[in-house]
């Protein structure tokens, strides 16, 4: 079911984005300032607003780099024997691509464990299958067909959450208390729930 697959992964990505933002207050402040400067006193940001939010888009790319929807891409079967990076792969071998490792490769990414949306601001790298260092949705003929829906949904959800609310940790918690453990499964969900306090902006 393509709709179920799209909503499940988008929900997981939204939680990971908010997790990363709460753990990185500098990024939270910067992306909220951008969103609120564009949104002003609007009740709801739409697609016309989203195109004016480059830092939000960079933040989403960085979220998908570190916390991609699925660590392993859809498996392939080799049609014939081949050599991949010096390794012999016999015909009829099931091959998995570990996107998690690719997207944290220190030979490709500077400080790969750091959540830094700025790395995408002056970069043409995108997650639509043309740049193999960033493939959270796969690549080639079997790339995820729901990329456009996932991208727009993520952008709208996060833009409006950040525009309309201020976010705080529950009393007694600090950002170091938030873990990034993952539940086992096809979709990479956060193991422990993210609990935040949302405060409505009074002047909206």
Where are these regions (language model features)?
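Central I-helix of cytochrome P450 enzymes
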Residues: 1-34, 63, 90-98, 135, ...
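Conserved cytochrome P450 catalytic core segment spanning the I/J/K helices
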Residues: 1-14, 42, 46-49, 53, ...
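Conserved beta-strand elements of beta-rich interaction domains across eukaryotes
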Residues: 9, 94, 101-103, 122, ...
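Conserved cytochrome P450 K-helix E-x-x-R motif and the immediately C-terminal K′/meander segment
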Residues: 46-87, 106, 113
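Cytochrome P450 heme-thiolate "Cys pocket" and heme-binding signature region
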Residues: 123-154, 179-184
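C-terminal helix/juxtamembrane-tail motif
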Residues: 167, 186-204
């Amino acid at each position: 079911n393509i709709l179920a697959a799209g909503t499940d992964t988008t929900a997981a990505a939204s939680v990971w984005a908010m997790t990363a933002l709460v753990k990185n207050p500098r990024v939270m402040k910067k992306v909220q300032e951008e969103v609120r400067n564009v949104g002003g006193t609007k009740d709801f940001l739409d697609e016309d607003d989203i195109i004016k939010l480059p830092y939000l888009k960079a933040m989403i790319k960085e979220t998908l780099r570190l916390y991609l929807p699925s660590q392993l891409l859809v498996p392939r079967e080799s049609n014939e024997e081949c050599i991949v990076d010096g390794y012999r792969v016999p015909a009829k071998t099931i091959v998995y691509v570990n996107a998690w490792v690719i997207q944290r490769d220190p030979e490709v990414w500077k400080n790969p464990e750091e959540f830094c949306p700025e790395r995408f601001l002056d970069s043409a790298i995108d997650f639509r299958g043309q740049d193999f260092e960033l493939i959270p949705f796969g690549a080639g003929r079997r790339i995820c067909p729901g990329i456009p829906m996932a991208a727009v949904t993520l952008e709208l959800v996060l833009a409006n959450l950040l525009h309309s609310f201020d976010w705080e940790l529950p009393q007694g918690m600090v950002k170091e208390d938030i873990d990034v453990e993952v539940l086992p499964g096809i979709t990479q969900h956060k193991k422990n729930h993210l609990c935040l306090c949302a405060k409505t902006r009074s002047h909206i």
